[in-house]
């Protein structure tokens, strides 16, 4: 049953809806607001030590583009399930694009920054623990993990543009802190409001540092 649900979700994002999602991510406003968003999120990091990053579910790479303007990144990887979005991602300068689902991806490399923005909300809840482990294992010692997702104190499934079982809100940060107790520390968090001068989609973000 778990496998069936996971496959349904992966097919959903691989298919036509994933392509439409790619089109919605081409907003000029979003490109501008992302830069301001990440500057705020990374205030408490040692930016000069962030030389590499990986993003899970980057779509066409707008987050990566914004971070390239803020950080001096030498190694960048994006793991994207949708083929069309992946092809766009692969065209970005200095980006290694991987066309896989997070469930089938295993990282041998470590990165100074691991990013999930609007990604965990689309993962089958029964696969979250493994996804958390993939995120943690991809992070270098003393590296940073940044997650920006829709928040709910209790797990809840939300209809997403008329589709069921493709969007789930919950307290991702607390779950990660419980799983990786004493292995990661929460060093900053905040909220991005859709009505801000540089709007985001009402995301709650959390910045962790992995212990060395």
Each predicted region: which residue ranges?
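Class I (Rossmann-like) S-adenosyl-L-methionine-dependent methyltransferase catalytic domain
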Residues: 1-52, 56-106, 123-130, 134, ...
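A conserved beta-strand element that flanks and buttresses the S-adenosyl-L-methionine
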Residues: 115
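Hydrophobic adenine-recognition pocket in adenosine-nucleotide-binding enzymes
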Residues: 119
């Amino acid at each position: 049953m778990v496998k069936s649900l996971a496959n349904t979700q992966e097919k959903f994002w691989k298919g036509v809806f994933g392509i439409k999602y790619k089109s919605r991510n081409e907003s000029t406003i979003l490109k501008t607001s992302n830069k301001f968003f990440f500057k705020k999120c990374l205030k408490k990091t040692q930016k000069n030590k962030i030389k590499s990053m990986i993003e899970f579910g980057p779509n066409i790479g707008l987050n990566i583009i914004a971070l390239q303007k803020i950080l001096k990144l030498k190694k960048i990887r994006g793991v994207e399930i949708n083929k069309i979005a992946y092809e766009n991602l692969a065209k970005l300068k200095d980006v290694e694009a991987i066309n896989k689902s997070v469930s089938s991806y295993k990282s041998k490399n470590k990165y100074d920054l691991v990013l999930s923005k609007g990604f965990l909300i689309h993962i089958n809840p029964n696969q979250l623990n493994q996804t958390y482990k993939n995120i943690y294992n991809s992070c270098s010692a003393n590296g940073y993990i940044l997650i920006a997702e829709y928040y709910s104190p209790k797990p809840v499934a939300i209809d997403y543009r008329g589709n069921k079982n493709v969007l789930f809100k919950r307290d991702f940060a607390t779950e990660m802190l419980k799983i990786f107790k004493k292995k990661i520390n929460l060093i900053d968090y905040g909220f991005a409001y859709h009505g801000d001068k540089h709007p985001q989609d009402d995301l709650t973000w959390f910045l962790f540092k992995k212990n060395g």
